[in-house]
Amino acid sequence: MALKIEKTFQVNEPVEKVWDFLSDPRKVATCVPGAQITEKVDEKTYKGAISVKVGPSVTDYKGEVRIVRLDNQNHEIEILGKGQDVRGRGSASMKMTGKLRALPDGGTEVISVSEINVVGILAQMGSRIITEVSNIMFGEFIKSFQERLQQPSEGSSETREVKPIKAGSMAWEAAKGVFRGKS
C-alpha cells in the first residue's frame, strides 16, 4: 500500500538551529515514537529499528536510512529508508523530502513530503487507518521535535528508553476519526 503524506508546521526557533537538528538522523530519531538509530554506517547512512505495538503483539522493524541529498545552503534534505519486519511479516520503504523556510518573526517553517510503501501486517489495516495513524504519529513527532529543539545541546548520542509505538490505541483513535469523517 502506497501513501503520500504532506505536512507543514512551524517552530519558534531560527532556521539554522532547526537545520542543525533536522539534518542529523540521530537527533531526529529521538523524536520518532518507537524509533532508534543503532549504527552509523557512514556519513550518510544509518541503521536503525522501530517497534510498533498493535494490540498485545509488538512488531519490530530493522532497516536503514540514507541521506541522498543534503543542501545546506537551501535547507533541503531527501532521505530514503527501508526496513523489514524481523519476523518476516512485512516491510516498509519511505522517501522523505524536507525543506525549511525562515519566517519574518525569526521562526522556521518545516515542509515535509513523505512517500511511504507498506507491505504485510501493517498494510492490512487499510490506507485510511494508516493515514490517520500517520497523522497522530506526526503530531507526536512535532511535539517531541519542538521540545528537543528548546533543550540545551548535549550532543547527538542521547540515551533514552525506546518504547514501541502504540498503534493499537492510535488505530482506535484513527478509526474514530474515519467514522467521524475527519480523513
Where are these regions (language model features)?
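A generic structural micro-feature
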Residues: M1, K40, G55-Y61, G88-A92, ...
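Hydrophobic ligand-binding cavity/cleft-lining segments
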Residues: M1-T45, A49-G55, E161-S183
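Generic structural detector for well-ordered beta-strands
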Residues: T8-Q10, S51-K53, R66, K99-R101, ...
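Hydrophobic pocket/interface hotspot
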Residues: V18-L22, V28, I67, S112, ...
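Glycine-rich portal/gate segments that line the openings of hydrophobic small-molecule binding cavities
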Residues: K40-Q84, K182
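Beta-strand/loop substructures that line and gate deep hydrophobic ligand-binding cavities in soluble
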Residues: R69, G83-V133
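A conserved amphipathic terminal alpha-helix motif
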Residues: I121-S156, G168
